[in-house]
Swiss-Prot record:
Annotated pathway: Carbohydrate degradation; pentose phosphate pathway; D-ribose 5-phosphate from D-ribulose 5-phosphate (non-oxidative stage): step 1/1
Top-rank EC class of the record's enzyme: isomerase
Keyword Isomerase belongs to the record: yes
Protein name, as recorded: Ribose-5-phosphate isomerase A
Taxonomic superkingdom: Bacteria
Organism whose genome encodes this protein: Streptococcus equi subsp. zooepidemicus (strain MGCS10565)
Annotated binding of substrate, by residue: 26-29, 82-85, 95-98, 122
Gene3D superfamilies: 3.30.70.260, 3.40.50.1360
NCBIfam families, per the entry: PRK00702.1, rpiA
Function (record text): Catalyzes the reversible conversion of ribose-5-phosphate to ribulose 5-phosphate.
Family the entry assigns: Belongs to the ribose 5-phosphate isomerase family.
Length: 227
């Protein structure tokens, strides 16, 4: 599995060219993309500037000598490469298994070309088998948890050890065990309208390419060619 993740990440790095501002994703597959960018800077003299999606990726990028800038100092990003936890046939996805969904969506939004790197196990017919992360403010989080519980969403707080995980943005994450999300766009809008929800892990209609690594090799799926 790690070999497939590395293959996807290295393939995505081939889309990066000199002078780009690039979004550096978070997670076990995006990790290999960031590593390959670091290698290309060192060995090929690649000239890029990165925008990171988590404190973990920031630390990795700094260790590799990748020049970084703040999302607040730019107006657009040429290319962002990130992982995904599930991708359906309509190119909607669930992200946030690494608890970085808020920063990931902020970086994805001004991106000209948004690429996901996944292994073939992440391709699904329907989203929802992977628990949907919902980032919520700490104030009122328990009340919101009960709202989700009454709605039948089977919520659970994301934990780190015996304490609730706190995201880079100082929020909690409530994971929803939905089983199957029949209409991701509609459910995303519902969460968007829920007071106390900062962001959710449904990335609907955002991705341009999905690079899939499988036993047979690498496949590049183009969202704009889907029917």
């Amino acid at each position: 599995m790690e070999a497939l993740k590395k293959l996807a990440g290295v393939t995505a790095a081939q889309y990066v060219t000199d002078g780009m501002t690039i979004g550096l994703g978070t997670g076990s597959t995006a990790y290999y993309f960031v590593e390959e960018i670091g290698r290309r800077i060192k060995e090929e003299g690649l000239q890029v500037v990165g925008v990171t999606t988590s404190s973990v990726t920031t630390k990795q990028a700094e260790g590799l000598g990748i020049p970084l800038t703040s999302i607040d100092d730019i107006d657009c990003i040429d290319l962002t490469v990130d992982g995904a936890d599930e991708v359906d046939k309509a190119f909607n996805g669930i992200k946030g298994g690494g608890a970085a969904l808020l920063m990931e969506k902020i970086v994805a939004t001004p991106t000209k070309e948004y690429i996901w790197v996944v292994d073939e196990s992440k391709l699904v017919d329907h989203l929802g088998a992977f628990k949907l992360p919902v980032e919520v403010v700490q104030y009122g989080a328990d009340r919101l948890f009960r709202v989700f519980e009454r709605a039948g969403y089977k919520p659970s707080f994301r934990m780190k050890g015996d304490k609730r995980l706190i995201t880079d943005m100082q929020n909690f994450i409530i994971d929803l065990d939905l089983g199957c999300i029949e209409n991701p766009c509609e459910f995303g809008r519902l969460l968007d309208q829920t007071v106390g929800v900062v962001e959710h892990g449904l990335f609907n209609g955002m991705v341009d390419k999905v690079i899939v690594a499988g036993q047979a090799g690498v496949t590049v799926l183009e969202a704009n060619q889907s029917t």
